[in-house]
A protein has these predicted regions:
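Short, flexible, solvent-exposed loop/turn segments with mixed acidic/basic and small polar residues
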Residues: 28-33, 64-70, 201
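Short beta-strand elements
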Residues: 29-30, 167-172, 242
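N-terminal basic/disordered segments at the start of proteins
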Residues: 1-52
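Small-residue-enriched alpha-helical segments and adjacent helix-cap loops
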Residues: 13, 37-177, 181-186
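Single conserved hydrophobic/aromatic residue that forms the stacking wall/gate
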Residues: 235-246
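Short cysteine/histidine-rich metal-coordination sites, predominantly Zn2+-binding motifs
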Residues: 171-175, 209-213, 232-233
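Iron-sulfur cluster-binding cysteine motifs and their immediate structural context
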Residues: 188-207, 219-233
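Cysteine-rich micro-motifs
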Residues: 214, 218
Length: 246
């Protein structure tokens, strides 16, 4: 094991100013000890390379207790780092292109679901969340806000990452726009069959989709062989509610 690793607390008493300073660097005090901290490593949008994985694991072995956890915002947290190892840990991570942070009254790390690759994803969540990360997390890194500000990007209305519970949430959607002229009133309507919430109905021989009941999940895309349901892709931004066509 590396000689720089310290596995036990020296019970070093730290001043509130010292604790606050390192918290601003992404280092949170372990409540069980006066001088042991957990260090948050930013992933950008939950994506890291295998080389970055190895660097984080090496840092955990070298400077912490050898354990790593994931935060709810998809950052990685190196556990059990003594106060005297904090600067060494941050420097080591920096050598591998990694940064620490994600604390305080600032823009917090951006959370993204796997909509880019998920069968239900309607937008490229990885690319969008990466842009948001660079623009707001990195770009506003030194901006102190009245309170922490959280952003999440969801690929569809399944809402896996709960965008609407963040300060700003983005939800990929597809809103169907039935074309009555193309609808042939099929007895076994494929649009009806594909809807998970049973919203589409044949009314007077034509397809009707209640806009208030439709959840915009996009499951009906391409299901009508006659093209009766073209769709408009949207990003839904909650709080405040807005729509932007993509």
């Amino acid at each position: 094991m590396n000689e720089e690793k310290i596995t036990t607390s020296a019970n070093k008493k730290l001043s509130p100013e010292e604790i606050k300073r390192v918290k601003g660097l992404g280092c949170l005090q372990d409540k069980r000890y006066d001088d042991i901290f957990n260090i948050r490593v930013i992933t950008g949008n939950g994506h890291i390379t295998t080389d970055e994985h190895r660097a984080i694991a090496d840092a955990a072995d070298k400077f912490g207790n050898g354990q790593i956890t994931m935060t709810t915002r998809l950052s990685m947290e190196i556990q059990g780092v003594p106060y005297d190892n904090i600067e060494k840990t941050i420097a080591f991570l920096g050598e591998h292109g990694l940064m620490t942070g994600g604390t305080g009254a600032k823009v917090r790390p951006v959370v993204s679901c796997k909509g880019t690759t998920c069968q239900y994803g309607l937008i490229d969540t990885f690319a969008l969340s990466k842009k948001i990360h660079e623009r707001f997390y990195v770009g506003y890194h030194d901006v102190v806000l009245p309170h922490k500000f959280k952003i999440a990007v969801g690929g569809c209305p399944n809402n896996c990452v709960k965008p609407n519970l963040n300060d700003m949430g983005i939800i990929g959607q597809r809103i169907p726009k039935p074309d009555s002229e193309k609808c042939r009133g099929c007895k076994k309507c494929q649009i009806e069959k594909s809807c998970p919430v049973h919203v589409p109905k044949l009314v007077d021989g034509k397809l009707y989709i209640d806009p208030e009941e439709c959840i915009h999940c996009g499951r009906c895309k391409g299901k009508c062989p006659f093209g009766a349901v073209p769709e408009l892709s949207l990003i839904h931004i909650s709080e405040p509610t807005r729509h932007a066509q993509i």
